[in-house]
UniProtKB/Swiss-Prot annotation:
Disulfide links within the chain: 31-102, 38-96, 39-84, 103-116
GO cellular component, one term: fungal-type cell wall
SMART domains: HYDRO
Subunit structure: Self-assembles to form functional amyloid fibrils called rodlets. Self-assembly into fibrillar rodlets occurs spontaneously at hydrophobic:hydrophilic interfaces and the rodlets further associate laterally to form amphipathic monolayers.
Signal sequence coordinates: 1-18
Function: Aerial growth, conidiation, and dispersal of filamentous fungi in the environment rely upon a capability of their secreting small amphipathic proteins called hydrophobins (HPBs) with low sequence identity. Class I can self-assemble into an outermost layer of rodlet bundles on aerial cell surfaces, conferring cellular hydrophobicity that supports fungal growth, development and dispersal; whereas Class II form highly ordered films at water-air interfaces through intermolecular interactions but contribute nothing to the rodlet structure.
Keyword Disulfide bond: yes
Alphabetical UniProt keywords: Cell wall, Disulfide bond, Glycoprotein, Secreted, Signal
Protein name: Class I hydrophobin pri2
Subcellular locations according to the entry: Secreted; Secreted, Cell wall
Amino acid sequence: MVAIKSLAILALPVMAMASPLVPRTDSPSQCNNGSLQCCNSSMTQDRGNLQIAQGVLGGLLGGLLGLGGLLDLVDLNALIGVQCSPISIVGNANTCTQQTVCCSNNNFNGLIALGCTPININL
């Protein structure tokens, strides 16, 4: 009886070591508060760029999308991403040859992305 209990106790670690390890396909996220984007270009929102952005994008957003004054609500320390497309860590993160950014859910069909922060993906 003692031999059966001992065998059962010794068998548990052996079975645990024999279990195959499943590799993780996801990596720790650097983009917790938005979406991961690959943008053709990005610009800071300093005074000169902000005036250009308000002129070009403000007119475009106001005229086409009915979102005039949107750039006044954007954090001045964040980036504006231009011509962005969403990427995923698993799928095509290494295919972004331009600027990889994390944008706070302000994507207008890839035209612009507001509230972005640059991130580095090394997979």
